[in-house]
Design a protein with these regions (language model features):
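Polybasic, lysine-enriched low-complexity intrinsically disordered terminal tails
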Residues: 1-27
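Nucleic acid-binding interface residues in structured DNA/RNA-binding domains
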Residues: 16-21, 29-33, 37-152
């Protein structure tokens, strides 16, 4: 079974309409920045350089994760930090921005776009994570689409 948008298991009802805030949040143009921490923050020590990325940076990253592969959030954060010459990537904005990417992609799926044509957020959001539980796609949909991408 293909985990298409209409076959979501426990997915929440979607209102992919013009009123959805996610495409607008995705479209906001902001620059990434690297800041120096003047106190410990979210497990990152004072004096460390911290990347505050953007939704687009996360969307670009997830688009590069190959079909059938997944990445843990920690790996995503570490790779983005290295790429932007920082010690770490902000864990708080990582969750916020990955949710924006996921919900904007979900709106596209709901409007008929093929999974192959959206940012494949399911490859970096673990179905058992707290973030997954907030998504309209639902945790079962994430499990189903991940399973569908695995070789048989």
């Amino acid at each position: 079974m293909s985990p298409r948008a209409g076959k979501r298991g426990n997915a929440r009802k979607s209102s992919a309409s013009a009123a959805s805030p996610w495409p607008a949040k995705m479209a906001q143009k902001k620059d990434a920045k690297v800041v120096m921490l003047d106190s410990d923050f979210a497990g990152i020590k004072k004096g460390a350089s911290l990347l505050v990325a953007t939704p687009e940076i996360f969307a670009d990253y997830v688009r590069k994760v190959p079909f059938g592969e997944t990445r843990r959030i920690e790996r995503v954060r570490n790779e983005l930090a290295r790429k932007h010459k920082a010690d770490a990537t902000c864990p708080v904005t990582t969750s916020i921005f990955l949710r924006i990417v996921a919900e904007a992609a979900w709106d596209e799926i709901q409007s008929g776009k093929a999974l192959a044509d959206v940012a494949p957020f399911w490859r970096v959001i673990d179905p058992d994570s707290p973030l997954a539980k907030k998504l309209r796609a639902g945790t079962q949909w994430l499990r189903d689409v991940r399973a569908a991408e695995q070789p048989t």
